[in-house]
C-alpha cells in the first residue's frame, strides 16, 4: 500500500479489546516453548496478565498505554494520545502485548490504513487484531480505537511565528507559560570587559552581555534562606570569579568553600548531583565521564551542606533489561541553581525576598570557565592553570601544555513566576530522590518570600513571557498524576507503568513549525529521526532515535522551497563529541550524525529538483563547527614536559590548533523566540525516559518579528554570538533569512576552515566559525570534503564508523 507523509498532529484514543482469548502468539512454535520454559524455571510465567497497547507509524513507536493487570479477556485502557508526527506511513498500527519481566509477548496487531485518516475526518472503529501472517487471531478479537489527523497546514500557528503578545505558549505541557518575567542570556561562563560589539536594539539601546558565573556567585553569596543546585557534575574546587579586572569580595573562595560558608550562616543548601554509576568501562576509557561525583559527596560529608548523589533510577514500568539500561546508561543532566534574592524595588533595607533561578548548559565544574576569545595556550598560566581540561588526548595535562579544550556554552537567569517553576522542579526531584524531607517550607516564610508574581509589567518593553520544559519521568520526579486523563491534559506521555514529561521535544517541534524566516541552532549533538534514515548497512527500526527535530527542520525547508519563500537553517555542532576521536563511541555518534544530515539533505535536494532549481543545498541548510588557532607569543606559558611524539596531542600542539567544544543547547527562531537548556538534539535528551533535562523557552511580546524584524534581547544575543564566532559584525547578518547572509556566512566559514586546516600559520584565526568538513552533492549524499578523510592532527574519520558492538541506546 502507498505510503503518505503524516506531518502534523495525530489524536488517538485506545479504548478496549472486546474479547481476548489469551495465549496470543506465545505458543507459536519452538521459540514460544522456550520462553514459556524459561519463565517457568525462573518463576515469572505463572503471574497475572499485564496487557498494554502501542501505536506505531510504520515501524516507529509513537505511543503506548499503561499496563492493565489481570484483565485477560477485556482490557479497557481509555487512553488518549496527542502525537506529533513527521512520518511516511501506509498504516497506523495498534499492537497488543502481554508484559513480563524479561520482555513482552505479542498478542497481535490491528492496522488502520493512513488513507482513512489523511483527509482529517474523525475515524472511530473496531479493528480486527491479526497475527504475524495477517490472519485474525484466535477468537477474532477486535480493538476499539479513535483517530483524527490534523495536518500542519491546518495549525493556525504554522509558519506564523509568535503572532502577538497573546501567544499562549506550547500546549499540553506540565508547566504553562508565565508572564511578567525577566530573562538574562549568557554566552559562556564569562564575558570580559573588552568584548564590546556595538549591537543596536529597538528603543535606541545597545545590547549588553551578561556574566554568568559572576551572577551565580552574587546569587549564592546574597542568598539568605535557600540554595538549591542540580548538576550532571558539580566540582567543589572551582572558583567562579577569575577576571583580575573584575574582582569581588570573597571571589577567591572555591565553590565548595562558598557553599559551606552559606550553610553555616543558616541557609539551606541542597545539592542533587548525578550518581555516575556507569563505570561502563567502554565509556570511561573514552573520557566521556569524569564527574567528580564521589569527591563532591566526600567533600560535604559532615558539613551542613546536604549533597545527595542521585542515580538515574528507572521508573518501575520497564522490564528488568530496560531498568538495567536506564540505571547504567542514562544520567541526570539538568543544570539549575535556585536561590532566594532581594526584591530590587524594596531597597537594601527590606527583608522581603523572591525566588531567582538559573537554567542552561553550563555545569558548575572544571573545564567550563571560558570567554568568547576561547584561547588555547594564552591562559595556561592564569585562569586555566588550575583548570586545564583536555579529555580528547590520552594523558593530557598542564605539565605537557596546550592546547586546552575551549568551551562554548549557553545559560540563562530567570526571574518572576518562571523562577518558581524551576524551584518546583527541584522540589519534585528532591522529594523523589533526595531522601530526608528538608526542603524549605516556603509557606512558613510567606511573610518574607513573596509568592510567584510578575517582576515586570506587561507594558514594560523589556518584559518576557517564558515557559519551562523538561525531559523527565516518574522515576526522577514526584508529583506526577496517576490518572491517564489528567496526565494527558498536562502533556505527560503514559508509558507502560511510568509517566513521562517530554515537553522539551514538544517545544522544539512547536517552535520549528511556527518558524517563518530562519532558525539558528547551537548544540553538542545533532542526530535523530532515525525512522527516516536510509537502510545503508543498518536496520533503521533497531536504532530508536525517534525524536522528530531533524525531520521537522528538513520538512520546514521543503515546505518553504515548494512555496517559493526564503528560509534558512544554520546549525553549529562540535567537530566531534568530547572524547578520544578515534574511539568507538565517538565514531559511532559521528556515523549517526552523518546519517541524520544525509536524510535532511536528501529531503532538501529532492525539493529543489522538483522545483527545477539547481542550487547549493548549503544555501538552505548549513552546518558549522568551531575551532581556534593561535600563533605563539612571547612570554607564553612553557610546559615542563612534552606530549609523546607522533600523537594527536603532539600534532595539535605543534599546529597550534584545536576545536572549540560546542556544549550549547540552544535554538533561536526568527530572532524572536529562544530555547535554552540542558537538552541535546539526540534521543537521550529528547526521550523523557532517558536523561533528565530542563529548558526554558521564551520571547519578548514587544519584540516580535511580526511587521518588522525583531530587535529585542534575542536578536542582540544572536548577533553577539555571531560576532564571537565570526570575529565581525556585518549588515547582512541582520537578516539571516536572506540568500546574501547565508552565502556570506558560508563563505567566511569556508575561508576560516582553510586557515584552520592549512599547513602554515602566520596569524591568529580571525574568527572561530568553521564549515563542518563534509561535502554535500546535488542529490543530498554526504561525502568527504576533498583531502579530509580525518580531522586535522588525528586519524579519526570525520564521517564516523558503524560500530556494531555498542548498543545504539548508548550512543543515540
From Swiss-Prot:
InterPro entries for the chain = C2_dom (IPR000008), C2_domain_sf (IPR035892), PLipase_D/transphosphatidylase (IPR001736), PLipase_D_C (IPR024632), PLipase_D_fam (IPR015679), PLipase_D_pln (IPR011402)
Q: Which PROSITE patterns match?
A: C2, PLD
Enumerate the spans annotated as PLD phosphodiesterase domain. 328-368, 658-685
Q: Which UniProt keywords apply?
A: Calcium, Cytoplasm, Hydrolase, Lipid degradation, Lipid metabolism, Membrane, Metal-binding, Repeat
Catalytic reaction equation(s): a 1,2-diacyl-sn-glycero-3-phosphocholine + H2O = a 1,2-diacyl-sn-glycero-3-phosphate + choline + H(+)
- What is this enzyme's EC? 3.1.4.4
Query: Where, subcellularly, is it found?
Result: Cytoplasm; Membrane
Which cofactors is this protein said to need?
Answer: Ca(2+)
Indicate the family of this protein.
Answer: Belongs to the phospholipase D family. C2-PLD subfamily.
Q: Domain comment, in the record's words?
A: C2 domain is a calcium-binding fold, and the binding promotes the protein association with membranes. A lower affinity toward calcium can be anticipated for PLD alpha C2 due to the absence of two potential calcium ligands.
- Give a short account of what the protein does: Hydrolyzes glycerol-phospholipids at the terminal phosphodiesteric bond. Plays an important role in various cellular processes, including phytohormone action, vesicular trafficking, secretion, cytoskeletal arrangement, meiosis, tumor promotion, pathogenesis, membrane deterioration and senescence.
User: Misc remark for this entry?
Assistant: All eight cysteine residues were shown to have free sulfhydryl groups by mass spectrometry. The propeptide appears to play a key role in the proper folding and activation of the enzyme.
> Any idea what this protein is called?
Phospholipase D alpha 2
Source species, please? Brassica oleracea var. capitata
Q: What gene codes for this chain?
A: PLD2
Amino acid at each position: 500500500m502507498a505510503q503518505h507523509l503524516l506531518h502534523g498532529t495525530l489524536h488517538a484514543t485506545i479504548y478496549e479489546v472486546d474479547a481476548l482469548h489469551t495465549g496470543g502468539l506465545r505458543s507459536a512454535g519452538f521459540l514460544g516453548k522456550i520462553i514459556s520454559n524459561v519463565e517457568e524455571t525462573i518463576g515469572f510465567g505463572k503471574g497475572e496478565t499485564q496487557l498494554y497497547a502501542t501505536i506505531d507509524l510504520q515501524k516507529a513507536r509513537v505511543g503506548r498505554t499503561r499496563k492493565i493487570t489481570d484483565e485477560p479477556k477485556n482490557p479497557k485502557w481509555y487512553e488518549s494520545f496527542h502525537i506529533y508526527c513527521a512520518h511516511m506511513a501506509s498504516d497506523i498500527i495498534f499492537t497488543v502485548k502481554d508484559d513480563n519481566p524479561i520482555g513482552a509477548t505479542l498478542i497481535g496487531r490491528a492496522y488502520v490504513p493512513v488513507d482513512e485518516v489523511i483527509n482529517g475526518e474523525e475515524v472511530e472503529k473496531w479493528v480486527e487484531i491479526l497475527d504475524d501472517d495477517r490472519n485474525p487471531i484466535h477468537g477474532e478479537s477486535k480493538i476499539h480505537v479513535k483517530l483524527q489527523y490534523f495536518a500542519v497546514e491546518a495549525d493556525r500557528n504554522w509558519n506564523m511565528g509568535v503572532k502577538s503578545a497573546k501567544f499562549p505558549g506550547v500546549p499540553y505541557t506540565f508547566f504553562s507559560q508565565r508572564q511578567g518575567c525577566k530573562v538574562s542570556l549568557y554566552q559562556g561562563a564569562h564575558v570580559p570587559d573588552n568584548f564590546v560589539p556595538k549591537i543596536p536594539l529597538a528603543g535606541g539601546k545597545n545590547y549588553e552581555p551578561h556574566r554568568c558565573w559572576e551572577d551565580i556567585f552574587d546569587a549564592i553569596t546574597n542568598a539568605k534562606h535557600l540554595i538549591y543546585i542540580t548538576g550532571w557534575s558539580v566540582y567543589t574546587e572551582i572558583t567562579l570569579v577569575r577576571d583580575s579586572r573584575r574582582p569581588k569580595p570573597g571571589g577567591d573562595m572555591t565553590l565548595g568553600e562558598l557553599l559551606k560558608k552559606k550553610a553555616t550562616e543558616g541557609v539551606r543548601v541542597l545539592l542533587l548531583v548525578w550518581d555516575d554509576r556507569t563505570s561502563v568501562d567502554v565509556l570511561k576509557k573514552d573520557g566521556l565521564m569524569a564527574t567528580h561525583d564521589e569527591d563532591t559527596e566526600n567533600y560535604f560529608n559532615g558539613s551542613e551542606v546536604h549533597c545527595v548523589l542521585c542515580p538515574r533510577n528507572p521508573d518501575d514500568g520497564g522490564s528488568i533489561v530496560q531498568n538495567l539500561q536506564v540505571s547504567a546508561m542514562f544520567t541526570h543532566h539538568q543544570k539549575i541553581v535556585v536561590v532566594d534574592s532581594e526584591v530590587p524595588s524594596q531597597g537594601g533595607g527590606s527583608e522581603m525576598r523572591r525566588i531567582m533561578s538559573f537554567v542552561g548548559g553550563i555545569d558548575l565544574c572544571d573545564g567550563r570557565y571560558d570567554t568568547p576569545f576561547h584561547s588555547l595556550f594564552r591562559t595556561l598560566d592564569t585562569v586555566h592553570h588550575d583548570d586545564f581540561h583536555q579529555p580528547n588526548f590520552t594523558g593530557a595535562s598542564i605539565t605537557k601544555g596546550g592546547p586546552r579544550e575551549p568551551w562554548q556554552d549557553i545559560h540563562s537567569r530567570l526571574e518572576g513566576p518562571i523562577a518558581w517553576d524551576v524551584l518546583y522542579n527541584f522540589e519534585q526531584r528532591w522529594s523523589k530522590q533526595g531522601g530526608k524531607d528538608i526542603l524549605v517550607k516556603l509557606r512558613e516564610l510567606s511573610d518574607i518570600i513573596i509568592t510567584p508574581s510578575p517582576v515586570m509589567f506587561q507594558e514594560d518593553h523589556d518584559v518576557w513571557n517564558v515557559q519551562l520544559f523538561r525531559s523527565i519521568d516518574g522515576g526522577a520526579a514526584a508529583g506526577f498524576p496517576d490518572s491517564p486523563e489528567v496526565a494527558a491534559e498536562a502533556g505527560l506521555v503514559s508509558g507502560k507503568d511510568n509517566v513521562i514529561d517530554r515537553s522539551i521535544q514538544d517545544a522544539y517541534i512547536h517552535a520549528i513549525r511556527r518558524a517563518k524566516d530562519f532558525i539558528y541552532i547551537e548544540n553538542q549533538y545533532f542526530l535523530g529521526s532515525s525512522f527516516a534514515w536510509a537502510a545503508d548497512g543498518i536496520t533503521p527500526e533497531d536504532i530508536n532515535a525517534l525524536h522528530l527535530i531533524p525531520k521537522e527542520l528538513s520538512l520546514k525547508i521543503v515546505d518553504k522551497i515548494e512555496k517559493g519563500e526564503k528560509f534558512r537553517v544554520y546549525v553549529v555542532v562540535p567537530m566531534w563529541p568530547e572524547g578520544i576521536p578515534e574511539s568507538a563511541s565517538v565514531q559511532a555518534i559521528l556515523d549517526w550524525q552523518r546519517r541524520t544530515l544525509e536524510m535532511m539533505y536528501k529531503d532538501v535536494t529532492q525539493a529543489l529538483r522538483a522545483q527545477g532549481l539547481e542550487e547549493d543545498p548549503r544555501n538552505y541548510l548549513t552546518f558549522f563547527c568551531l575551532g581556534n588557532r593561535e600563533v605563539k607569543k612571547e612570554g607564553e606559558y612553557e610546559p615542563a614536559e612534552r606530549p609523546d611524539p607522533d600523537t594527536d596531542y603532539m600534532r595539535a600542539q605543534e599546529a597550534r590548533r584545536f576545536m572549540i567544544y560546542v556544549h550549547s543547547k540552544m535554538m533561536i527562531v526568527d530572532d524572536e523566540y529562544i530555547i535554552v537548556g540542558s537538552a541535546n538534539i539526540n534521543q537521550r535528551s529528547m526521550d523523557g525516559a532517558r536523561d533528565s533535562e530542563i529548558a526554558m523557552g521564551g520571547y519578548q511580546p514587544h519584540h516580535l518579528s511580526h511587521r518588522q524584524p525583531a530587535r529585542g534581547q534575542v536578536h542582540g544575543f544572536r548577533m553577539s554570538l555571531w560576532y564571537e564566532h565570526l570575529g565581525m559584525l556585518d549588515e547582512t547578518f541582520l537578516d539571516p533569512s536572506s540568500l546574501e547572509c547565508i552565502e556570506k556566512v558560508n563563505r567566511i566559514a569556508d575561508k576560516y576552515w582553510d586557515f584552520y586546516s592549512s599547513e602554515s600559520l602566520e596569524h591568529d584565526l580571525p574568527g572561530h566559525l568553521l564549515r563542518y568538513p563534509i561535502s554535500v552533492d546535488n542529490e543530498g549524499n554526504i561525502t568527504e570534503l576533498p583531502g579530509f578523510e580525518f580531522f586535522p592532527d588525528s586519524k579519526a574519520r570525520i564521517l564516523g564508523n558503524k560500530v556494531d558492538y555498542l548498543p545504539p541506546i548508548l550512543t543515540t
